[in-house]
């Protein structure tokens, strides 16, 4: 039995609320159970120097956690003078994941910056961030379309992410903190709306896992991502 009493293939309660920040070109408040992330998408008419003159744009991401997003206060990274390795890893993952869904040439020579700020953390902050970031990105693209800033479609499709793990010997979907901290294995899957894989991160925390166990996790992830994509489509409709 999972601590949350969910079925092995059951997501937490998920909500995707679009347009929550009036100043941003795109925004989304995403909730996976008690994990809440505020995501904004900012359009910038500038590019990294190494991309200038190439006729294509860029999508990048930044990620951070509020000090009391966690059970005990976490020191702000700004006060330490540098970002932690985990933060850098997650924001690069978010950027890579979103670029897989974007036609950068159709975007033109401009940049969209995604900011993911974790308000409350209860496991799965990176997967919630990616899922909500796609909604904020789509919101931003629609903002651009409404102003005739785009000549062609920019988004190739949906991108969503979900965690899976082996908890008490059972493959389960969408781990919360209680499960993640005790799981034998945990993995994060980033996929397209068609179920194609963008990235997989998997670790045997306690016990190495077999091919069959990995395939069971991937099957769960595909089901979970399909549900998340349905919610994304409803959010941007």
UniProtKB/Swiss-Prot annotation:
The lineage of its organism: Bacteria, Pseudomonadati, Pseudomonadota, Alphaproteobacteria, Hyphomicrobiales. Belongs to the RNase PH family. It holds the Pfam family RNase_PH_C. Phosphate binds at residues 86, 124-126. Homohexameric ring arranged as a trimer of dimers. CDD domains: RNase_PH_bact (cd11362). Its EC number is 2.7.7.56. Gene3D superfamilies: GHMP Kinase, N-terminal domain. Signal peptide: none annotated. GO terms for biological process: rRNA catabolic process; rRNA processing; tRNA processing. GO terms for molecular function: 3'-5'-RNA exonuclease activity; tRNA binding; tRNA nucleotidyltransferase activity. It comes from Nitrobacter winogradskyi (strain ATCC 25391 / DSM 10237 / CIP 104748 / NCIMB 11846 / Nb-255). It is an enzyme of class 2 (transferase). It catalyses: tRNA(n+1) + phosphate = tRNA(n) + a ribonucleoside 5'-diphosphate. SUPFAM superfamilies: Ribonuclease PH domain 2-like, Ribosomal protein S5 domain 2-like. Phosphorolytic 3'-5' exoribonuclease that plays an important role in tRNA 3'-end maturation. Removes nucleotide residues following the 3'-CCA terminus of tRNAs; can also add nucleotides to the ends of RNA molecules by using nucleoside diphosphates as substrates, but this may not be physiologically important. Probably plays a role in initiation of 16S rRNA degradation (leading to ribosome degradation) during starvation. This is Ribonuclease PH. InterPro entries: ExoRNase_PH_dom1 (IPR001247), ExoRNase_PH_dom2 (IPR015847), ExoRNase_PH_dom2_sf (IPR036345), PNPase/RNase_PH_dom_sf (IPR027408), Ribosomal_Su5_D2-typ_SF (IPR020568), RNase_PH (IPR050080), RNase_PH_bac-type (IPR002381), RNase_PH_CS (IPR018336). Keywords: Nucleotidyltransferase, RNA-binding, rRNA processing, Transferase, tRNA processing, tRNA-binding.
């Amino acid at each position: 039995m999972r601590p949350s009493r969910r079925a092995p293939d059951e997501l937490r309660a998920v909500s995707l609320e679009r347009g929550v920040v009036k100043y941003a070109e795109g925004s989304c408040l995403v909730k996976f159970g008690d994990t809440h992330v505020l995501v904004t998408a900012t359009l910038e008419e500038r590019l990294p120097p190494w991309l200038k003159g190439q006729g294509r744009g860029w999508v990048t991401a930044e990620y951070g956690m509020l000090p009391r997003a966690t059970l005990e206060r976490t020191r702000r990274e700004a006060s330490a003078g540098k970002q932690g390795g985990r933060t850098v890893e997650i924001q690069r993952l978010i950027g890579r994941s979103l670029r897989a869904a974007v036609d950068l040439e159709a975007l033109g020579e401009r940049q969209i910056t995604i900011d993911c700020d974790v308000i409350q953390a209860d496991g799965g902050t990176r997967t919630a961030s990616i899922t909500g970031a796609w909604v904020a990105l789509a919101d931003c693209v629609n903002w651009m379309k409404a102003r005739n800033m785009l000549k062609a479609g920019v988004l190739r499709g949906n991108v969503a992410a979900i965690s899976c793990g082996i908890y008490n010997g059972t493959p389960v979907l969408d781990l919360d903190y209680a499960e993640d901290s005790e799981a034998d294995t945990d993995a994060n899957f980033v996929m397209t709306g068609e179920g194609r894989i963008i990235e997989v991160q998997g670790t045997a925390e306690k016990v190495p896992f077999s091919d069959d166990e990995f395939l069971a996790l991937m099957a769960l992830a595909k089901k979970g991502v399909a549900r998340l994509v349905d919610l994304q489509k409803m959010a941007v409709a």
